[in-house]
């Protein structure tokens, strides 16, 4: 089974609600012919978040027929490993980079260095082109303003363990890639003991763990819970539904952890039946147009330096960011 080190920490706390050598990559040239045929996408991202960019890709390349299989990162990673000798997917879109790195270590991905990577920080690229980051997400605390005053809202992720919030906090469970990435990053920055204590404290504080962040944001927006731990764009999606919610970008004090930010990403499947289409799709995700879709429709932070941020999203430069090695988490 596909597992990461942090699974043993999260799963034992019952938080959930429900290499072979790689050939040197070459920079992808512009294709002489427009993509056509089929494209099978496995996505650890929810259909609602990945479908807009797929629809734009299809509009750009109408000769391509796209099939999307959405699920959890771990489920799809297991499938990719099981299908390695007979790949059923052409490209995998993941909610975080740990899964991509683990699959790269297992020889699942084909090297592909998109020409668009020149506009993406090397921090979010595999050195051999086996995967690339796509967008960034900040881990934030959202709260219902009818139930929590701004001065009382938690300012740190560690405040979520305060007994005053017992039974009043919602979060995504252990199957969620963003939580997994956050815990892995905390382990790297703070050590196993402190990261595990944080998880234990959340459990002791009767945090309600949902299957995904959409359920979390809606529960907070409806006043079923006072506080939610989410990716920043879920706050903006809830604001768009006219809910009375506000957001804290946590741990900004001088001696505090800093804002945890993680990345989505994608990799082309080695031996894919529609290899050229898979590469064209990754190229599109990294294009100025693709990045703008993520930013403007999903409120995400684009990785391209020239892609505009949504006007309602605060720039990451406003915050002190927790610095970690995205590959080693």
Question: What annotation goes with each model-predicted range?
Answer:
Residues 53, 194, 198, 231, ...:
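Short amphipathic alpha-helical coupling segments at ligand-binding clamshell hinges
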Residues 43-51, 71-74, 87-225, 257:
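Extracytoplasmic ligand-binding site segments that recognize negatively charged/polar headgroups
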Residues 98-102, 221, 226-247, 298:
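A ligand-binding cleft/hinge motif common to bilobed small-molecule-binding domains
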Residues 167-174, 284-305:
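Periplasmic-binding protein-like
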Residues 142-147, 261-274, 293:
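A bilobed periplasmic-binding-protein/Venus flytrap-type ligand-binding module shared by bacterial periplasmic
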Residues 192-197, 302-329:
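An extracytoplasmic/periplasmic, membrane-proximal ligand-sensing/linker region
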Residues 1-38:
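Short, low-complexity disordered leader/linker segments with a strong preference
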Residues 35, 40-65, 81, 141, ...:
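Short, polar/charged alpha-helical segment
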């Amino acid at each position: 089974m596909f597992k990461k080190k942090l699974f043993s920490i999260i799963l034992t706390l019952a938080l959930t609600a429900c290499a072979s050598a790689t050939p040197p990559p070459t920079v992808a040239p512009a294709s002489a012919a427009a993509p056509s045929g089929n494209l099978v996408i496995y996505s650890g991202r929810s259909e609602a978040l990945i479908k807009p960019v797929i629809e734009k890709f299809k509009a750009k390349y109408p000769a391509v027929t796209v099939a999307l299989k959405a699920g959890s990162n771990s489920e799809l990673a297991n499938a990719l490993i099981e299908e390695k000798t007979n790949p059923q997917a052409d490209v995998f879109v993941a909610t975080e980079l740990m899964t991509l790195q683990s699959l790269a270590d297992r020889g699942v991905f084909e090297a592909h260095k998109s020409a668009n990577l020149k506009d993406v920080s090397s921090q979010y690229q595999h050195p051999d082109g086996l995967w690339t980051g796509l967008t960034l997400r900040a881990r934030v605390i959202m709260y219902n303003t009818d139930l929590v005053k701004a001065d009382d809202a938690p300012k740190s992720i560690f405040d979520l363990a305060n007994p005053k919030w017992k039974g009043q906090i919602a979060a995504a469970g252990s199957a969620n890639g963003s939580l997994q990435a956050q815990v892995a990053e905390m382990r790297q920055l703070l050590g196993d003991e402190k990261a595990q204590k944080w998880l234990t404290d959340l459990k002791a504080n009767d945090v309600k763990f949902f299957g995904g962040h959409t359920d979390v944001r809606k529960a907070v927006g409806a006043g079923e819970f006072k506080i939610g731990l989410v990716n920043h764009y879920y706050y903006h999606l809830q604001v768009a539904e006219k809910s009375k919610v506000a957001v804290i970008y946590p741990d900004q004090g001088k001696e505090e952890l800093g804002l945890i930010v993680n990345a989505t990403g994608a990799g082309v499947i080695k031996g894919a039946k529609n290899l050229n289409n898979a590469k064209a799709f990754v190229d599109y995700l990294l294009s100025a147009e693709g990045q703008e879709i993520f930013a403007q429709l999903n409120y995400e932070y684009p990785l391209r330096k020239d892609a505009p941020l949504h006007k309602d999203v605060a720039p990451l430069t406003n915050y002190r960011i927790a610095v970690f090695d995205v590959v080693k988490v």
